From Swiss-Prot:
Role played: Produces ATP from ADP in the presence of a proton gradient across the membrane. The catalytic sites are hosted primarily by the beta subunits.
Cited Pfam families: ATP-synt_ab (PF00006), ATP-synt_ab_N (PF02874), ATP-synt_VA_C (PF22919)
InterPro entries for this protein: AAA+_ATPase (IPR003593), ATP-synt_VA_C (IPR055190), ATP_synth_F1_bsu (IPR005722), ATPase_a/bsu_AS (IPR020003), ATPase_alpha/beta_chains (IPR050053), ATPase_F1/V1/A1_a/bsu_N (IPR004100), ATPase_F1/V1/A1_a/bsu_N_sf (IPR036121), ATPase_F1/V1/A1_a/bsu_nucl-bd (IPR000194)
Single Gene Ontology MF annotation: ATP hydrolysis activity
Gene that specifies this protein: atpD
CDD domains recorded: ATP-synt_F1_beta_C, ATP-synt_F1_beta_N, F1-ATPase_beta_CD
Keywords from the named record: ATP synthesis, ATP-binding, Cell membrane, CF(1), Hydrogen ion transport, Ion transport, Membrane, Nucleotide-binding, Translocase, Transport
Annotated localization: Cell membrane
Broad class of the protein's primary localization: membrane
Top EC class, one word: translocase
Species classification: Bacteria, Bacillati, Chloroflexota, Dehalococcoidia, Dehalococcoidales
Record's subunit section: F-type ATPases have 2 components, CF(1) - the catalytic core - and CF(0) - the membrane proton channel. CF(1) has five subunits: alpha(3), beta(3), gamma(1), delta(1), epsilon(1). CF(0) has three main subunits: a(1), b(2) and c(9-12). The alpha and beta chains form an alternating ring which encloses part of the gamma chain. CF(1) is attached to CF(0) by a central stalk formed by the gamma and epsilon chains, while a peripheral stalk is formed by the delta and b chains.
Identification of the protein by name: ATP synthase subunit beta
Nucleotide-binding as UniProt keyword: yes
Length: 464
């Protein structure tokens, strides 16, 4: 028989039997015709006796043994090209926005090889984000991979939404957003925000959210990546790829691994963790044709940075933004820890001597303040030397100046968002380090844009 039939159904795992001469290849998409459309499966393993074990992308409710299964003879393929811009898709490439079918130029399989070594090209060009703490401490490389790491509720999604607003608005190319195992409400909010800001016509969005089956959450990142690869390779564009959240991709892999009966490894993760992460991350690359700059939110379970699921991501990142709960508790937003965040291109040969020196001096002052906090807690400020008192005062001003009102949180805070250029960021911190603003109150530096805004705020406070 050319087609197969369902032998066993356990949750979202379906066993299908084929004849010996028509066995489907691994990762082939299989279809089961249903009254209300079709059910799509993906072949995961050959288990012997002409049987294959598959994972379903759609709920298996009502599926019975003996149902006919059709081999599409190719991996799951999704629409790509300019007609996907401004639209929202699911893992199968079907539109979710009730705006009719997509007339795509072509479709591409979601399983592809990474670019060959001789096609790769790395850039050392800084991509300005308009966020002071990131541009100063962990500058982004155009065509690089950037990770925003943090536990639950410290602001990863808000930060990634702000980056979409700042960079996609300023950026000329196309953007792809992949929602991987996150909240549907946030995806809905993001869609409306992007529509209001005028960014949506240059953006393709794909969603496989928390309520979806594990196979969907595992493959949705590949669907988004395939669409981004088309813009890079065929359109020769510089593409922005946003993934929220890459940890949910790992978690979906863990669920799939358990469903397929594989032996778990450390902390219950799948034994193929590094391979799966590498297969995804190596495809997010910049070639001679174009670049993919990726921003990935990384959930850190229980704030444990040694968790294998988090560690698997580290080695692939060019810049790492660590979001710290203690800063969020003090309402210092964005809650980026300037001492734990880093970037491959924070190098005087790339960013220039002045930027490098100011960034390192800021970190030095903040580190000294951190070292002195135990002394201050036990003995009080009076016991510090004059030099240390000055360091603490400047560190507290720097801490507050690292905060910034965001465009995407205007509705919550009532403060208009601020985009600060890199030159203004460097000037502001340099003046604080030089002591030009030692006379201004600390509060004047909180939630302002440029250093001139801080001076204006200080005048307002003194007049009050």
């Amino acid at each position: 028989m050319a087609n197969g039939k369902v032998i066993q159904v356990i949750g979202s795992v379906v066993d299908v039997e084929f004849s010996a001469d028509s066995m489907p290849a691994l990762f082939n998409a299989l279809e089961i015709p249903r009254d209300n459309g079709k059910m799509v499966l993906e072949v995961q393993s050959h288990v012997g006796n002409n049987r294959v074990k598959c994972l379903s992308f759609t709920p298996t409710d009502g599926l019975e043994r003996g149902a006919e299964v059709i081999d599409t003879k190719r991996p799951l393929s999704v629409p790509v090209g300019r007609n996907t811009l401004g639209r929202i898709f699911n893992v199968l490439g079907e539109p979710l926005d009730n705006r009719g079918d997509v007339k795509a130029e072509k479709t591409m399989p979601i399983h592809r090889s990474a670019p060959a070594m001789d096609e790769l090209e790395s850039s050392a060009q800084v991509l300005e984000t308009g966020l002071k703490v990131i541009d100063l401490i962990a500058p982004f490389a155009r065509g690089g991979k950037i990770g925003a790491l943090g536990g639950a509720g410290v602001g990863k999604t808000v930060l990634i939404q702000e980056l979409i607003r700042n960079i996609a608005t300023e950026h000329e190319g196309f953007s792809v957003f992949a929602g991987v195992g996150e909240r549907s409400r946030e995806g809905n909010d993001l869609w409306h925000e992007m529509e209001d800001s005028g960014v949506l016509p240059k953006t393709t969005m794909v969603f496989g959210q928390m309520n979806e089956l594990p196979a969907v959450r595992l493959r949705i990142a590949l669907t988004g990546l395939t669409m981004a690869e088309y813009f890079r390779d065929e359109e020769r564009q510089d593409v922005l790829l946003f993934i929220d959240n890459i940890y949910r991709y790992t978690l979906a892999g863990m669920e799939v691994s358990a469903l397929l009966g594989r032996m778990p490894s450390a902390v219950g993760y799948q034994p193929t963790l590094a391979t799966e992460m590498g297969a995804l991350q190596e495809r997010i690359a910049s070639t001679k044709q174009g670049s993919i700059t990726s921003f990935q939110a990384v959930y850190v379970p229980a704030d444990d940075y040694t968790d294998p699921g988090v560690v698997a991501t580290f080695g692939h990142l060019d810049a790492m933004i660590a979001l710290e709960r203690s800063l969020a508790e003090q309402a210092l937003y964005p809650a980026v820890d300037p001492l734990a965040s880093n970037s491959r291109i924070l190098d005087p040969q790339v960013v220039g001597e002045e930027h490098y020196q100011v960034a390192r001096d800021v970190q030095k002052v903040l580190q000294r303040y951190k070292d002195l906090q135990d002394v201050i807690a036990i003995l009080g400020m009076e016991e510090l030397s004059e030099e240390d008192k000055l360091t603490v005062a400047r560190a507290r001003r720097i801490q507050r100046f690292l905060t910034q009102p965001m465009f995407v949180s205007e509705v919550f805070t009532g403060r208009p968002g601020q985009y600060v250029s890199l030159a203004e960021t460097i000037r502001g911190f340099k003046e604080i380090l030089e002591g030009k603003h030692d006379s201004l109150p600390e509060q004047a530096f909180y939630m302002v844009g440029t250093i001139d805004d801080a001076v204006a705020e200080a005048k307002k406070l003194s007049a009050a």
